[in-house]
Regions:
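Glycoside hydrolase catalytic-domain groove-lining segments
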Residues: 1-43
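Flexible loop/turn segments at secondary-structure boundaries
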Residues: 6-10, 37-42, 83-88, 171-174, ...
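Alpha-helical scaffolding within the catalytic cores
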Residues: 13-21, 58-66, 145-150
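Active-site-proximal beta-strand/loop segments in catalytic clefts of secreted hydrolases
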Residues: 1-5, 33-37, 78-82, 167-170, ...
């Protein structure tokens, strides 16, 4: 479980790498089988009070990114599907005064999870990302993770389909590009606080060498199938 490992943010990477290195000694795989927002997650106000916005969605996406990239988690699960006035459900259930029954509404957290789970299929392999700066110099290891900026990870499904997930945690747009060994087109899907952008199909691109990622958004890029 990833409870109590997300603050301070600077601690997220090191504690997961330590876990990864320990498990490697014993040839044991990691499944992250349960997590939700807790009281110590102060960056988003702790667990109390349901939140439908990108605030919680981005916070959890950063958690997923670190668990997959640095802990090498082979599986990742959220705590519960439907909840009340707490940040532990993908859906919020409530009963309005005088209403005959409950109302259920979705959240950006639900769709942010889909930026990963809808495209990265069982058996997928995570791929290494190598970064270069504007002068084409290779940047230090783990450059694809900026906890308050861009966080990128890439995967190959068993059928050869490539998936790239990019989190932009920053309050401003960020631009980045990717070079991949494929001539296939890419489909782009985005979750953000912009109206209607809940795992929304944005369009196709022939290449992804220069893409602008909107503020506070999660974008998935997927190669099209033949």
């Amino acid at each position: 479980h990833s409870y109590w490992t997300n603050t301070p943010v600077e601690y997220m990477k090191d504690c997961r790498k330590a876990l990864r290195d320990t498990l490697r000694k014993y040839d044991v795989e990691l499944w992250q089988s349960e997590v939700c927002i807790m009281g110590n997650d102060e960056e988003i106000g702790g667990g109390g009070g349901y939140d439908r916005t990108m605030k919680t969605a981005l916070y959890v996406a950063r958690m997923i990114h670190h668990d997959l990239v640095f802990a090498n988690a082979r599986s990742w699960q959220w705590w519960r599907a439907i909840g009340g006035d707490y940040k532990d459900g993908l859906l919020f259930r409530y009963r309005a005064p005088g209403a005959p029954g409950d109302t259920i509404v979705d959240s950006k957290l639900l769709w942010a999870l889909g930026n990963y789970s809808f495209f990265i299929r069982p058996g997928a392999k995570r791929l290494e990302l190598r970064c270069t700066d504007k002068q084409c110099r290779i940047e230090p290891d783990e450059c694809a993770t900026r906890p308050y900026g861009l966080m990128s990870s890439a995967y190959r499904n068993n059928d050869g389909q490539l998936v790239v997930v990019v989190i932009n945690y920053a309050p401003e747009s960020k631009t980045a590009g990717f070079t991949a060994p494929t001539n296939k087109h890419w489909k782009i899907y985005r979750t953000s606080d912009n109206g209607g952008e809940s795992l929304k199909y944005i369009g196709d691109k022939a290449d992804i060498a220069n893409i602008t990622f909107p503020p506070r958004s999660i974008t998935t890029l997927v190669t099209t199938q033949d």
